[in-house]
């Protein structure tokens, strides 16, 4: 099965077939079609190595055999705590093809959360990416006061000699341990017995308001809701072969969709980094043609580029500003034509300024060859989308949820920053009570693992998933995300405020990494701001602001004046009740490993208030 280049009706017909298929079936079909073509590339010892589809399938079968030899059986779980790697993909799919259930643990998780997820998933075998990840597994067991795992496989085993644990083996030892004839017969039997409605894996929720819950998908649900769903919300990913970089955590649904499942039925070749390699370095080497990132990544790269330009000489600053202005005009023209494809030869002036000023900057970032781009996982400021579109990157926002898969994207490739979203085949999106998004159709999750009460609470009487997201709906059936239902604030003046909209306006500043809005039951809104230290430090050097460390920098009068200006600039785009009256800078960089945020850096609002209650109270005491 290959949907790349197919007309949309034919691609959707293939999607219907996915709903009746299993991962091992689709994998085997892919191998039969393109056995000698590259499945993915991974960097090792400074060199990119290729794995063909035939070799990929063989290594996945080898991993499955090794799991069986260690007693794993269909329906049982394995856990993986690691950064993206070839071994991660192979281990996860090795479990999937025999009907076992893998789940990822974010490498940034604190030891307490690792212990919780090991218990919730009841994993028998765990894979650790390196020494740091292995230490988290062992610390989790110490916190739990019990041995939670039967076997531990260490992917990067350079420090294995430090440990004296009989459960611990290297990945190479693991791969060489399942070759008996009895195991091979068992492997073939279990592959044949997997059905489309068997669980394929768990994806744990972010845990912003409580303990994470393990959402589980069936084989069909995963491939339709997250795999094919990603092609629906990013149609340009389906139109031609693409080169992508693998950087999203594979514990996340979006990361799994792009790295594990989309390549099974679309011409997407992923490129995995060497251990410890930065995303910027990887992009420079790979020069991807499509890039999917969370808002934080798009904002960070844009902010760093902007500060570099502002720190340059007068001539370059003005030339870049002129090129950017031309880019804004061009993007506006493209947005006015449905599904417009840029044709540079008809825009000679823009092309000249683009090649002279913008293209070199994008080339240095590794983004000069990107023809398709999307942001997902959280709201992204409209100004960030506008900036990237002015730079020639057709960035747009996509929407999905852990429980409902990929649900919506703008109708056009070059979309307005706040363009309404249209529902994705084969799901239906409707308005529920209070404007909550209700999702139904193919590709919805099957429930929360061993939590029937939470599962029942997530579905309404019509079998629709209650996403918890509030939206505004148009007469044409499209919708705009407003905020999480649980996060809506009501001021003492009875005004309903969506914090995400205000926070998004504040995070449009290159100096703001995170914003947290308060004001429920109060007369006005206040904000805690996490500074983007790297960008702020560049600004300080350019403006001769002296400091000795983080604390002295954020307390500097010039910095406070800068943030006052940034907040006022954000307020200019907000209605009066939404404007921020007071703010404070968070006196540290938020760290997921210390529990400041979720592992994906989502804000835990109650926890944030508890940590910085004195700052919030101070902003209201000054009234």
Describe the predicted segments one by one.
Residues 428, 432, 436-491:
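Conserved ATP-binding/catalytic segment of the ANL
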Residues 36-38, 169, 173, 178-204, ...:
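Conserved pre-ATP/AMP-binding loop-to-beta segment of ANL
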Residues 19, 39-93, 110-115, 170-175, ...:
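Conserved AMP-binding/adenylate-forming core of the ANL superfamily
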Residues 26-51, 584-590:
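AMP-dependent adenylate-forming
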Residues 489, 514-517, 560, 564-623:
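Conserved C-terminal "lid"/linker of ANL adenylate-forming enzymes
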Residues 69-70, 93, 97-176, 562:
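Structural core segment of the AMP-binding/adenylate-forming
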Residues 223-243, 250-355, 359, 364, ...:
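Conserved AMP-binding/adenylation subdomain of ANL enzymes
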Residues 50-54, 200-226:
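Conserved AMP-binding A3 loop
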């Amino acid at each position: 099965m290959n949907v790349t280049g197919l007309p949309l009706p034919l691609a959707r017909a293939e999607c219907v077939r996915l709903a009746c298929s299993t991962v091992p079936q689709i994998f085997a079909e892919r191998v039969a079609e393109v056995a000698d073509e590259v499945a993915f590339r991974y960097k090792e010892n400074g060199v990119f190595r290729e794995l063909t589809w035939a070799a990929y399938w063989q290594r996945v079968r080898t991993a499955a055999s090794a799991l069986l030899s260690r007693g794993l059986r269909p329906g049982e779980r394995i856990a993986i705590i690691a950064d993206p790697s070839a071994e991660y993909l192979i281990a996860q799919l090795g479990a999937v093809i025999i009907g076992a259930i893998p789940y990822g643990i974010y490498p940034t998780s604190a030891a307490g959360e690792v212990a919780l997820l090991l218990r919730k998933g009841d994993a028998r075998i765990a894979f650790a990416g390196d020494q740091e990840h292995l230490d988290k597994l062992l610390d989790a067991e110490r916190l739990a006061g019990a041995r939670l795992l039967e076997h531990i496989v260490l992917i990067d085993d350079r420090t294995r000699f430090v440990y004296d644990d009989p459960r611990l083996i290297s990945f190479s030892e693991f791969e060489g341990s399942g070759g008996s004839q009895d195991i091979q017969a068992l492997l073939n039997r279990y592959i044949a017995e997997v059905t489309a409605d068997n669980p394929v894996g768990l994806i744990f929720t972010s845990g912003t308001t409580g303990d994470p819950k393990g959402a589980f998908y069936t084989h069909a649900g995963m491939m339709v809701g997250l795999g094919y769903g990603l092609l629906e919300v990013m149609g340009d990913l389906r139109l031609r072969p693409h080169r992508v970089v693998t950087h999203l955590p594979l514990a996340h649904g979006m990361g799994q969709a792009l790295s594990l499942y989309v390549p099974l039925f679309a011409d997407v070749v992923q490129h995995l980094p060497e251990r410890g390699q930065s995303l910027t370095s990887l992009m420079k080497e790979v020069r991807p043609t499509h890039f999917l990132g969370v808002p934080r990544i798009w904002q960070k790269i844009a902010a760093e580029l902007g500060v570099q330009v502002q720190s340059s000489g007068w001539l370059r600053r003005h030339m870049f500003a002129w090129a950017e202005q031309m880019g804004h005009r061009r993007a506006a023209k493209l947005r006015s034509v449905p599904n417009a494809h840029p044709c540079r030869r008809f825009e000679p002036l823009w092309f000249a300024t683009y090649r002279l000023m913008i293209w070199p900057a994008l080339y240095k970032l590794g983004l000069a060859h990107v023809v398709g781009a999307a942001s997902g996982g959280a709201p992204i400021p409209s100004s960030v989308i506008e900036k990237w579109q002015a730079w020639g990157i057709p960035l747009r926002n996509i929407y999905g949820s852990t429980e409902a898969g990929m649900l919506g994207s703008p109708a056009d490739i070059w979309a307005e920053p706040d363009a309404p979203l249209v529902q994705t085949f084969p799901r239906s999106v409707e308005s529920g009570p209070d404007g909550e998004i209700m999702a139904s159709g193919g590709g919805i999750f099957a429930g929360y693992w061993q939590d029937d009460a939470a599962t029942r609470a997530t579905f309404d009487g019509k079998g629709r998933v209650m996403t918890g997201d509030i939206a505004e709906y148009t007469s044409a059936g499209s919708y705009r995300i407003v905020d999480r239902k649980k996060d809506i604030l009501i001021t003492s003046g009875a005004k309903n405020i969506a914090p995400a909209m205000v926070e998004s306006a504040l995070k449009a500043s290159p100096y703001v990494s995170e914003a947290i809005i308060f004001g429920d039951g109060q007369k006005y809104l206040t904000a805690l701001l996490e500074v983007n230290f790297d960008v702020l430090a560049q600004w300080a050097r350019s403006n001769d602001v002296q400091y000795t460390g983080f604390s002295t920098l954020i307390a500097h009068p010039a910095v406070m004046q800068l943030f006052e200006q940034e907040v006022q600039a954000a307020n200019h785009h907000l209605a009066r009740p939404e404007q921020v009256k007071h703010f404070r800078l968070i006196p540290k960089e938020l760290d997921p490993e210390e529990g400041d945020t979720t592992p994906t850096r989502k804000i835990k609002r109650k926890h944030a208030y508890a940590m910085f209650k004195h700052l919030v109270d101070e902003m209201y005491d000054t009234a």
